């Protein structure tokens, strides 16, 4: 055992012994008091049983007062004896009559009995206490140890060092310290007392490891306490300081704690709701996820309260939501949904909650959506005239009408001292009453974060961005004040120039454009009828847009067109945000298109813009946008010219574009019908605009368009393309063949002169390698065909026959002639080899001599078979004489893209007909077609050289 373990055991034994001593001291004191009470009882009993007092035990009413006085006197004597101590108590009770002969003897007997009973009780109690200590030694040791620790700390013992020693030295093992802390926290949560000093000591040890779960738990508890403290301290006077201080804590991690603290504080103090709403708006402007979570939880809280008929819960929830709408944290659509739910089936409680809701948000609703506000008050007037509510509720409605008449003087939208958020920093959440979401209760509790340090660093950067602006502004203000004291006049001039330049820059930036978009969005979303939306949008496009003074007319016109374009873009954006397509948007677009040509141009540009970026939207948004434009096209409000931007090909389209077109054409078919839609698309002035969707020139594009429209159940629209598709396919095949033939001719003519290098006689020795082609026995299978009987080997006797047929052979050919009609695959061969030189200067194929190699096997009947091996592809002959097997069969093997001209080799059973030297060069080029072999022109050795086309030979 180590020294530390021995020291730990000794300290534990000392603590146990000290615990036993204290327990014995307490037991002895308790037994001493019991013995004194026993002594008093025994003393009175002995005196009552004495012979002199035996007669007093009989009942006598006259003696009862004396008995009471005697008891009272005895009790006084016992109290005096307890005050005087044990030493005088042994001599007998004070005030006893020593002259009585029974007194000393009775006192001695009582003393003996007292001592015996005391000893017996002490021994019995010691045994019981020992057993109890053995059974519960762990819990008693912990409790007594904690008490000793607290006593030592209070007496002035150094708490840090002493406490660490007495808590079993958890620094040696952090895991043991964590387990000990866990046990203590469980005891504390179960109602047991745990010294805070002991918990702090363990926590201090665990703080050293920042990746541990205990450290994160401690930090989470500290975060909860800090947020709760700041929320409880906030007021209208210190909200600026509290808002800056609350950002120093990690609100992303503690957003659930913040929402819970704010909701709890607001429900307990409804008059402070504007303060909590302002604090939430400040946090929401920098961290929108916090504001969204709070809105969701308030909606869920209202739902639960409404289902359970809890008026207080509903009242606190709608009050908070009303002020959040005033600060643009929640949208006014949520206000209208709540009022519709409360006034749909009016009761006393629902009307009371609705009245309180309208008091807080009535001014905001009248400013943003006056039509909806009027509808709400009309509903309240109808409820009031029904007279089914209590008098108290009716009086509340009448009071609300009076408040509205006074212009909500006591219920402003935002109080002046709480107007701390700029309009540009508003972040509005489109959360509806019927949306499906959760309150994320897990955020209220601790969850270990594996990336704790990384997330903390990220929030530190975010905190610097949020709080750094205010620090910079304060520094700038202080510097400006110092400079103002020194140079007031110069700085005044600079400020004027800066303001002038700033105003000019602000007019040309997107700040006003963003404000315009917000106004358009709020106008469209809060208006109930088409006429009202059109009127407000036209008014916004004319009055709200301010053109900077001094701007040239052309630039002012461009700026105005750009900003009016935003009206149409925002109308389509609002339509895309809807969960289900609303026909109000289609009617609004139709009305705007019929106002002027400017609106038509704007919508045409809008269609092209949204079609080009449609892949950025979700499927539901694509559906709404496509339905909107489909309705405009079907109603002839939007020009068909917009379809010029559509190119329906596999290369130019993507899945989002195809989905958009499918939904748009489906909407047009629903509005017009298939027959009328087909008639519209077949009109001449429309055909020029839909050429990209219904192509008529490219067969592959036509085929793709036909397949697409057939797949979306719009096959009748492709009847015209189906008619022209076969002609396009034939035309493409014909053009393809012509291109291939032209390419072959071009390649052959370009490589025609490349064979002049064969003038050297010795260069033909390399062609001896063609003898190896005898190994191609696979071609022997052709000998079984009867069609080859008419062909003989190349000899003197069959030249006339070849001349009559008009077929010349100017190439080196390899011919094999079997000994019989069908010969076996393996047979002996005998060959005679000869080489002959032929020169042809006239270029006529049948008359010239040729250089050949003939292999004679036997003089019997043979088949003439010529194999020509070339290094380039051979063109097909165009003449009829080259078709089929009208000439001898030749197999052509292409090795490369080299010219078609080559030297041929012939094998024959008959002797060679050619004369001349056995080894001589030949300049006769040869074109070898694939199947039907046709003679090719020969190039002479002497000038003039003449090029002969293949077509001239047939």
UniProtKB/Swiss-Prot annotation:
Composition-biased stretches, type Low complexity, lie in 749-766, 781-793, 855-873, 885-929
Q: What range(s) does the MIF4G domain occupy?
A: 224-407
Which residues belong to any copy of the MI domain? 515-648
Location in or out of the cell = Cytoplasm; Nucleus
Listed Basic residues bias regions: 64-82, 801-814, 822-836
Q: Which GO terms describe its cellular component?
A: catalytic step 2 spliceosome; cytoplasm
Give the keywords, sorted. Cytoplasm, mRNA processing, mRNA splicing, Nucleus, Spliceosome
Q: Where is this region: Disordered?
A: 1-172, 467-506, 733-766, 781-954
Q: What SMART domains does the annotation carry? A: MA3, MIF4G
Q: Locate the compositionally biased regions of type Acidic residues.
A: 147-161, 468-498
PROSITE patterns named in the record: MI (PS51366)
GO BP, sorted A to Z: mRNA splicing, via spliceosome
Q: Major place of localization?
A: cytoplasm
Q: Which GO terms describe its molecular function?
A: RNA binding
Question: So what family is this one in?
Answer: Belongs to the CWC22 family.
Q: What is the recorded function of this protein according to its Swiss-Prot or TrEMBL entry?
A: Involved in pre-mRNA splicing.
Instruction: Relate the assembly described in the record.
Output: Associated with the spliceosome.
Q: What protein is this chain from?
A: Pre-mRNA-splicing factor CWC22
Q: State the organism of origin.
A: Yarrowia lipolytica (strain CLIB 122 / E 150) (Yeast)
The coding gene here is: CWC22
